[in-house]
Amino acid sequence: MKNLLFAAAAVLMFVACDKVKMDVKTGSDKTDSVVTEEWKPVDSATANKAWMDYATPGDMQKMLAKSDGTWIGETTMWMENGGQPMTSKSEATNKMMYDGRYQISNHKGNFMGMPFEGMSITAYDNAKKKFVSTWIDNMGTGIMQTEGVWNPSKKAIEFKGKMTDPTRPGKDCDVREVYTFTDETHQTMEMYGPDSKTGKEFKTMEIKFTKK
């Protein structure tokens, strides 16, 4: 395992070195050159330990694993700030994968009378010291990507990221999600996005989950 990780690290460093050289070369041919960060070599022992630490699940992954199972969701949505709430029910099934490194979640429900399905992959990136997440569903063709930090006092993860705004072609909009782990059988997800009229952030969705 250690040899495999070291080999992977060596390949990545080789590719990165070539990229730095390429950036420097191409930059010299242009008037507006991009200043690249100086590459600092890392010895094999340090690189090997870094990859081992990066690949080893820890406490944050164990915390994610506690959410494994099936959850029933009570969903409330708002199409605009101060608008009439719409309610529906949903179901989410969470399962850790790749020896406890990632959690895949499959969601089913309805949106304005139409069947809704979505899937997320969530992980704790040991190198970034952040949670990372992706989301896809049958109501779009893009991928939402967010990163978040754990707040121990609130028992919550606050994710921030970008998602496609199809009403403004070629542009993304800011999105924020707060996952609160109330206890082992109750969780709440709050989602915030821009109001279509003002662009100001407001709560677009809230899902109260109860473990089945």
Role assignments for model-derived ranges:
Residues 5-12:
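Sec-dependent N-terminal signal peptides
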Residues 15-16:
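C-terminal motif of bacterial Sec signal peptides marking the signal peptidase cleavage site
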Residues 20-36:
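Short, low-complexity, disordered segments immediately C-terminal to signal peptides
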Residues 55-72:
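N-terminal helix-cap/turn-to-beta initiation motif at the start of protein domains
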Residues 74-176:
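Central antiparallel beta-sheet cores of small beta-barrel/beta-sandwich binding domains
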Residues 98, 181-185:
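Residue-level recognition of beta-strand termini and adjacent short loop/turns
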Residues 186, 191-212:
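Edge beta-strand at a domain terminus
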